[in-house]
């Protein structure tokens, strides 16, 4: 189109960038003087600049790009390439901008005497670039597509056009407007690189004139201009092609770079071009753009912007987070961009609607169309977000031409303004919202002079490489455009236009034409929104515009914002398949009874211990129970208080035969809570079995406790239940502080079971029952089996908590059907995979109760079970288990990890609607409240009519068939979600303001917990707020409490302990931490702000029951360390802490079991951990029992004997000739000694290469081990595990190493004083055997790093460097024992080699206590000693505290040796002249002087220059822990001192 004028406030198009960073001490320095504005020839030099200059706001150069350019210059290359770095996009805003492409063309232009190429050509004037130009220039350099900011237009010209005269007019335009002949370059004036604009003396517009024979050529030329790369350093920023088809048919193709012109400038350009061409008039020079940029810089320097900056700081003081993507986005999160791929959709708004928009704006708001469009967009964005945010920030573009003179200037003036909006108030009309928006924007426009990038720096806006700062959606409003223009006697008509692309998510462009029409376009990033998404936004915007012109006074919330077509389509997607058969008229117990008659001998239910009931037996016992229940009077409710067992199933089926209502209770819940349930449902009876008789009697009250029958009745009992009767009542957490009972009918249950069977094509399933009985999944599993002719397998309580045992049970029973939460499945598949792989019948894994974990997908696929299908189910208890389901793994599943895991389409006979706040349907892709209709909707809440009425509402969208069947109610879930285009549901979470959450599948009302805390505190807690921290298995409840003013601080621990003990809540509902706060945060409506609550800081109150807790012992510190690895948050732990009270749960207990095994090598049964949740009790499980304690009874002969493969290697071994250059195998390279040893090896001239084996941490790289590039070239890492039989090396690698290596240094080991020998055998002894065999086969030296601790086995005062084979260790000293065994193994091999006459250098190195530096010596080593090293810690904290522990009775002799000395000694031995002596050589790396504790203290005092305080050991350790000493180290140190008082230690001797 042709742009002619802009009559409003000139809101124009814009360019926005994202952020990153880069810096370096090398910068471009551009020569030239600001005192000589003319005839300047800037020249490029490379120099060093103070690193501090990088933090200057004017610095526009990226260091890494400069390094590349420097390298290119040295190599004689004139151009550089910017490295792909997604982070560097922030450089502009820092302004640390990258410099690649722009300078390279100039470097090849003109040779010079000094070899430094000059830029061309000379300039008339030079001035700093504007802020907007800097923004464009940086992006031009940074983005990979240099055509991003090209603007291209094509016109058809009818009439006798004179191409040469038109070309002359273009050149005249360049004379009039300096911006059309401006070059852009960097100059380091004032020592900092800055972007300058140089005004060239002549036009640089590239004009071509062609005669063409086809309109196809027009398209080709247009594409060429569109894709042209403009040369900014040479001022070549515009390209024109004049094409003649016939004397009266012409085409004009015009292109330019956005840095030279903005949209308003294009209007000025066209107007001036018309005048010059039509009249031949020579127009005088227009006002200069460079004067504007100079004024802009001066305004910033003179603080002219201060008032406006203060305004923006005030208005944007509480910025909202970046706007979420709309739900219909193609991706779940934004990504950093280095190119913009933008597409768009457009629609013309006819004169009729356009006139109404103008009239409405004027009459209703006294304003213009622009403000009405902006208000409509504002409301649309809130609706599309589903009101997920109450605050948003939108951008508008401003022409930046407040000065009248600027209306004549061609240049880059456009600016962008951020506008923060709040959601409309309840009941607020559009009229009022329009007035509010107009006032807000008009005020903002008075402060529009501040450049966008100055505003960002001043506000210190947090940058991200993935989204635009401040706003992600912009409204670009244009006025006065026309499709046609006059060129002399010719008419020019717009054919097409390609605008510059932006990095914004979305740009809404509104163009107002002089003929009264409007054109509305929505432009967006292709990777974010598809064309359908853009079209939906556009359609919705037009709909709201139509609405407000008809009903401007209507409340905003009542405005219809989506078109009827999209709503109708959404309703169609919301409804599942409708199927109604004769079975829907039956109850599930009828379906069960039918199979009992047909196949009475089939197994119906069985326990893990082998007990089972056939269908006939189960029917008989159930009917006997039904008979007994029929004899009783009272309500139909029957409470079942049984452990999961055969009795439980007999109870459920018997209750249903009797036509009664099943009410399950979890016997592990507090008795007070169970009593509340009994009082609410007033049961006819409470069923129990032997294990629960006392509980049942205690709960009974007026009810009758009935034992479950152990035998069946002789005659049949007729089924009393019908589809309209209540099948069960499940109690869930309630907001009033009491649990609420959900009433589910037999019709609801039948609907669910049949829908599941149809959707998942279920047959005769073997179903695992492992859910809690009070969970709806429990009922689902029972009748998935019994109503489908299958078998139910009951997992006992102890197996339910152990994923390995559970998986084993599944494999034994050949389970086909499971129902669990994501967290439960994660543990099952991670820890029980080997057993699950044997469960070849496994067909259906249903996942529900919490968000599906995408990490489960590869885990399930790795099981390689071809028949297995994994399903994601969604649905609350109130709709009978589930309403939607999606196959995730299987033939028709997603089968890949993805950010978006849908819940699937509605099940048969269910409807899943997404409704807005007015309970109206929204289109697919728009979030709203999930509301469920159909045959599974429950009957309401027991004894709670008000809550029932608010949550179970009339379904006005129900089909006629649904209404006829009585399915005319809708359950409002309070969950947020949206529908995909295929009708699949995506669950987003809870609606704003909801206090309901899910904790590992269990529904929790936070209000209930808060009420219980206040009620239980005996008045000491005035108010409480509870929130969830973490996700899935890591989710914990955190409580924040406001205390009565007179509550003493020192009583907080006892208060919290009291609350933890007495809260009448199930364990999963008890907070794991309590924090005292002065007040709780509330939102503007006065409600508790849970989002703000979760961000409150504060130290959790320790839960103590002892005012003077004893320090933790060694085992307790080990356990505390394990707890901290698995517990979320920062729990305060003591010996009396309970794992479940500080954030633990049964799923984390599984993780804890593995961590304990990793730390100690001891496997503790889950049942033991579960039954002893206290810290002290759990720690006692780590103490070795006498019956299992490892002693010298270990068969050391067998342990250290030579294996057949090792003997074979010895038989064929021969000495390999030494080489001047050696390749070395090294283990333990990442450890304290290993790192130093590695550095010395790499630096040694004889070492050709170092092969580091068994690098366990996959994140370790060559760069992390050495910063020297020459050393890195000599280094190869092999990630693996010492415990692996071949150190994780494959045969090919072993063979390759065998042919290359000349030396083996085995320094690696698993260092743990907690683990027994049997645990350390594999990593410490088997690894020695493998490497020893490799050395013998190759015939090369073998050096083994043992420990000086083995000499203590001798019991002698001193011990020389000789064998200790005659002093076998106790097996419980695992680390020492493993080193002794390796020494003995090496000795046996050396003796066997000697018998064959083969001499291989075999050396055992025994280092004493290795330290970074010895006491009394200056300096430090580059390596840091292990954090858990006892002696190092003792010395380190003695230095820090200038305090020493009292050591009476401790006969320690401190033998410290520096790490550098040990490494040098090993290297000297390995690379020095070989010892000709036979057998194993022993080397002691120790200090000649052994220090007593007194001597050590004196050394440290002399080193520090002061006297150290001496305190008893317990006090010293307490202080050290406060200074940071690890608790386990502290406890071990105390334990060592206590156990070793009076013990005589063996000193290491240096000579034999």
Swiss-Prot record:
Gene null: resulting phenotype: Abolishes the production of acurin A.
Region (Adenylation): 594-999
O-(pantetheine 4'-phosphoryl)serine PTM sites in chain numbering: 1146
EC number per UniProt: 6.3.2.-
Single biological process term from Gene Ontology: amino acid activation for nonribosomal peptide biosynthetic process
Residue span, Carrier domain: 1110-1186
Disulfide bonds: none
Enzyme class: ligase
Stretch list, region Condensation: 129-564
A Gene Ontology term for the protein's cellular component: enterobactin synthetase complex
GO MF annotation terms: 2,3-dihydroxybenzoate-serine ligase activity; phosphopantetheine binding
Region annotated Thiolester reductase (R) domain, chain positions: 1226-1464
Involved pathway(s): Secondary metabolite biosynthesis
Sorted UniProt keywords: Ligase, Multifunctional enzyme, Phosphopantetheine, Phosphoprotein
Entry's induction text: Expression is positively regulated by the acurin A cluster-specific transcription regulator acrR.
Pfam families listed in its UniProt record: AMP-binding, Condensation, NAD_binding_4, PP-binding
Family, per entry: Belongs to the NRP synthetase family.
Family matches, as NCBIfam families: AA-adenyl-dom
Function as written in the Swiss-Prot or TrEMBL entry: Nonribosomal peptide synthetase; part of the cluster that mediates the biosynthesis of acurin A, a highly reduced polyketide coupled to a serine via a peptide bond. The activities of the highly reducing polyketide synthase acrA and the nonribosomal peptide synthetase acrB are collectively responsible for the synthesis of the acurin A core structure with a heptaketide backbone produced by acrA covalently fused to a L-serine by acrB. After the formation of the PK-NRP hybrid product, it is detached from acrB by reductive release to set up the formation of the lactam ring by aldol condensation.
Domain notes: NRP synthetases are composed of discrete domains (adenylation (A), thiolation (T) or peptidyl carrier protein (PCP) and condensation (C) domains) which when grouped together are referred to as a single module. Each module is responsible for the recognition (via the A domain) and incorporation of a single amino acid into the growing peptide product. Thus, an NRP synthetase is generally composed of one or more modules and can terminate in a thioesterase domain (TE) that releases the newly synthesized peptide from the enzyme.
Protein name (database record): Nonribosomal peptide synthetase acrB
Gene: acrB
């Amino acid at each position: 189109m042709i742009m002619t004028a802009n009559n409003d406030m000139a809101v124009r198009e814009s360019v926005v960038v994202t952020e990153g960073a880069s810096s370096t001490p090398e910068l471009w320095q551009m020569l030239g003087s600001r005192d000589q504005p003319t005839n300047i020839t800037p020249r490029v030099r490379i120099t060093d600049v103070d690193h501090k200059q990088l933090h200057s706001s004017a610095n526009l150069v990226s260091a890494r790009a400069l390094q590349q350019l420097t390298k290119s210059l040295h190599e004689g290359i004139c151009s550089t390439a910017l490295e792909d770095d997604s982070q560097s996009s922030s450089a502009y805003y820092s302004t640390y901008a990258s410099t690649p492409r722009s300078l390279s063309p100039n470097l090849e232009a003109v040779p010079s005497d000094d070899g430094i190429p000059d830029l061309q050509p000379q300039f008339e004037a030079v001035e700093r670039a504007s802020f907007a130009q800097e923004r464009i220039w940086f992006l031009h350099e940074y983005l990979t597509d240099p055509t991003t900011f090209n603007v291209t237009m094509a016109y058809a010209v009818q009439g006798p056009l004179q191409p040469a005269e038109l070309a002359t007019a273009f050149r005249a335009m360049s004379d009039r407007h300096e911006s059309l002949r401006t070059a852009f370059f960097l100059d380091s004036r004032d020592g900092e690189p800055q972007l300058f604009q140089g005004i060239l003396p002549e036009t640089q517009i590239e004009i071509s004139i062609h005669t063409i024979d086809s309109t196809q050529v027009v398209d080709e030329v247009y594409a060429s201009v569109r894709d042209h790369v403009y040369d900014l350093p040479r001022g070549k920023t515009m390209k024109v092609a004049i094409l003649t088809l016939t004397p009266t048919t012409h085409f004009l193709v015009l292109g330019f770079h956005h840095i030279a012109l903005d949209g308003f400038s294009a209007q000025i350009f066209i107007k001036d071009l018309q005048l010059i061409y039509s009249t031949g008039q020579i127009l005088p020079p227009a006002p200069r753009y460079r004067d504007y940029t100079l004024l802009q810089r001066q305004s910033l320097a003179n603080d002219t912007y201060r008032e406006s900056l203060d305004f923006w700081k005030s208005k944007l003081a509480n910025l909202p987070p970046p706007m979420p993507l709309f739900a219909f986005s193609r991706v779940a999160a934004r990504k950093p961009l280095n190119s913009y791929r933008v597409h768009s959709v457009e629609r013309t708004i006819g004169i009729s609607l356009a006139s109404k928009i103008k009239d409405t704006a004027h009459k209703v708001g006294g304003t213009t169309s622009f403000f009405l469009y902006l208000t409509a967009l504002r409301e649309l964005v809130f609706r599309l977000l589903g009101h997920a945010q109450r605050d948003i920030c939108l951008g508008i573009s401003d022409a930046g031409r407040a000065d009248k003179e600027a209306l004549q200037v061609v240049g880059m003036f456009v600016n962008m303004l951020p506008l923060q909006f709040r959601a409309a108030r309840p009941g607020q009309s559009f009229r009022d919202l329009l007035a509010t928006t107009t006032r807000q924007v008009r005020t903002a426009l008075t402060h529009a002079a501040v450049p966008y990038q100055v505003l960002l720096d001043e506000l210190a806006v947090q940058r991200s490489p993935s989204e635009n700062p401040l706003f992600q959606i912009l409204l670009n409003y244009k006025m006065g455009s026309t499709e046609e223009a006059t060129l002399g006697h010719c008419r020019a008509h717009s054919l097409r236009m390609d605008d510059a692309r932006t990095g914004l998510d979305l740009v809404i462009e509104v163009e107002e034409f002089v003929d009264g029409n409007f054109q509305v376009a929505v432009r967006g990033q292709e990777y974010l929104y598809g064309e359908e998404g853009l079209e939906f936004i556009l359609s919705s915007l037009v709909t709201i515009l139509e609405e407000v012109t008809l009903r401007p006074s209507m409340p905003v919330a009542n405005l219809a914002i989506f078109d009827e077509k999209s709503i109708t389509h959404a309703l169609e997607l919301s409804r599942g398949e409708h199927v109604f058969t004769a079975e829907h008229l039956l109850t599930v117990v009828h379906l069960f009874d039918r199979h009992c008659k047909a196949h009475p001998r089939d197994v119906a239910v069985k326990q893990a211990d082998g007990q089972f009931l056939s269908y006939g037996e189960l029917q008989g016992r159930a009917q006997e129970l039904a008979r007994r229940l029929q004899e009783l009077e009272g309500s139909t409710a029957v409470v079942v208080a049984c452990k999961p067992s055969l009795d439980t199933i007999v109870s459920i089926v018997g209750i249903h035969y009797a036509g009664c209502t099943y009410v399950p209770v979890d016997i592990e819940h507090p008795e007070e809570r169970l009593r509340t349930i009994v009082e609410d449902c007033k049961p006819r009876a409470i069923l129990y079995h032997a294990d629960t008789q006392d509980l049942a009697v205690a709960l009974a009250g007026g009810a009758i406790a009935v034992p479950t029958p152990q035998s069946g009745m002789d005659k049949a009992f007729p089924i009393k239940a019908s589809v309209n009767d209540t099948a069960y009542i499940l109690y869930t957490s309630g907001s009033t502080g009491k649990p609420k009972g959900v009433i589910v009918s037999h019709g609801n249950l039948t609907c669910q079971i049949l829908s599941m069977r149809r959707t998942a094509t279920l047959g005769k399933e073997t179903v695992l029952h492992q859910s809690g009985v009070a969970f709806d999944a429990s009922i689902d599993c029972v009748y998935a089996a019994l109503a489908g002719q299958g078998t139910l397998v009951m997992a006992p309580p102890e197996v339910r908590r152990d994923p390995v045992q559970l998986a084993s049970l599944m494999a034994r029973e050949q389970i086909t059907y499971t129902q669990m939460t994501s967290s439960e499945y994660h543990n099952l598949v991670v820890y029980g995979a080997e057993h699950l792989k044997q469960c070849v019948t496994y067909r259906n894994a249903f996942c529900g109760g919490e968000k599906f974990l995408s990490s489960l997908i590869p885990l399930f696929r790795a099981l390689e079970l071809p028949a297995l299908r994994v399903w994601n189910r969604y649905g609350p208890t109130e709709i009978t288990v589930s309403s939607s389901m999606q196959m995730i793994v299987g033939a028709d599943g997603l089968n890949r990890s993805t950010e978006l895991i849908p819940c699937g389409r509605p099940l048969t006979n269910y409807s899943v609607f997404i409704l807005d706040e007015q309970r109206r349907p929204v289109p697919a892709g728009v979030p709203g409240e999930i509301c469920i209709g159909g045959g599974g909707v429950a009957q309401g809440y027991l004894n709670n009519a008000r809550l029932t009425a608010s949550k179970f509402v009339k379904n006005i969208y129900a089909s006629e068939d649904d209404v006829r069947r009585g399915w005319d109610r809708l359950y409002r879930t309070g969950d947020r979600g949206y529908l995909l285009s295929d009708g699949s549901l995506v669950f987003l979470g809870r609606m704003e303001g909801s206090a309901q959450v899910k904790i590992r599948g269990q529904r929790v009302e936070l209000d209930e917990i808060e009420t219980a805390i206040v009620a239980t505190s005996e008045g000491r807690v005035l108010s409480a707020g509870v929130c969830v921290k973490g996700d899935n298995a890591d989710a914990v409840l955190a409580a924040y409490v406001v205390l009565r003013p007179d509550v003493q601080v020192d009583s907080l621990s006892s208060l919290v302990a009291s609350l933890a003990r007495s809260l009448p809540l199930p364990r999963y509902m008890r907070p794991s931490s309590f924090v005292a706060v002065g007040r709780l945060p509330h939102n503007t409506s006065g409600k508790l702000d849970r989002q703000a609550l979760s961000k409150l800081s504060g130290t959790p109150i320790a839960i103590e029951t002892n005012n003077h807790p004893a320090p933790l012992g060694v085992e307790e510190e080990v356990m505390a360390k394990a707890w901290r690895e698995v517990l979320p948050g920062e729990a305060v732990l003591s010996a009396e802490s309970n794992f479940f009270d500080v954030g633990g749960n049964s799923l984390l207990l599984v993780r804890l079991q593995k961590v304990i095994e990793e730390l100690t090598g001891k496997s503790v049964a889950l049942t033991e951990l579960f039954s002893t949740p206290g810290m002290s009790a759990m720690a006692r499980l780590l103490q070795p029992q006498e019956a299992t304690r490892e002693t010298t009874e270990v068969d050391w002969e067998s342990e250290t004997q030579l294996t057949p493969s090792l003997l074979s290697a010895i038989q064929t071994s021969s000495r390999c000739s030494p080489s001047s250059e050696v390749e070395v195998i090294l283990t333990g390279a990442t450890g304290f000694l290993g790192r130093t040893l590695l550095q010395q090896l790499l630096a040694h001239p004889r070492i050709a290469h170092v092969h580091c084996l068994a690098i366990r941490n996959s994140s370790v790289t060559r760069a992390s081990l050495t910063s020297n590039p020459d050393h890195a070239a000599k280094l190869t890492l092999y990630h693996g595990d010492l415990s692996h039989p071949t150190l994780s090396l494959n045969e090919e690698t072993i063979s390759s190493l065998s042919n290359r290596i000349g030396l083996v240094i085995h320094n690696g080991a698993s260092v743990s004083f907690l683990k027994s020998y049997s645990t350390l055998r594999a990593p410490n002894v088997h690894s020695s055997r493998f490497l020893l065999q490799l050395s013998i086969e190759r015939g090369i030296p073998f050096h083994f790093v043992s420990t000086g601790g083995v000499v203590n086995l001798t019991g002698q005062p001193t011990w020389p460097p000789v064998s200790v084979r005659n002093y076998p260790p106790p097996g419980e000293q695992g680390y020492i024992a493993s080193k002794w065994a390796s020494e003995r193994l090496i000795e046996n091999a050396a003796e066997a080699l000697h018998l064959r006459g083969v001499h291989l250098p075999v050396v055992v190195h025994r280092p004493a206590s290795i330290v970074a530096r010895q006491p009394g010596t200056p300096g430090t080593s580059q390596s840091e000693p292990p954090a858990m090293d006892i002696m190092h810690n003792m010395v380190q904290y003695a230095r820090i505290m200038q305090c020493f522990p009292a050591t009476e009775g401790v006969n320690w002799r401190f033998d410290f040796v520096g790490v550098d000395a040990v490494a040098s000694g090993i290297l000297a031995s390995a690379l020095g002249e070989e010892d000709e002596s036979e057998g194993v050589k022993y080397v002691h790396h120790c200090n000649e002087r052994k220090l007593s504790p007194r001597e050590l203290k004196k050394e440290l005092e002399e080193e520090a220059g002061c006297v150290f305080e001496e305190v008893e050991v317990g006090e010293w350790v307490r202080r050290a822990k406060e200074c940071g000493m690890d608790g386990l180290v502290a406890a071990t140190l105390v334990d060592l001192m206590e156990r070793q008082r009076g013990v005589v230690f063996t000193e290491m001797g240096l000579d034999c």
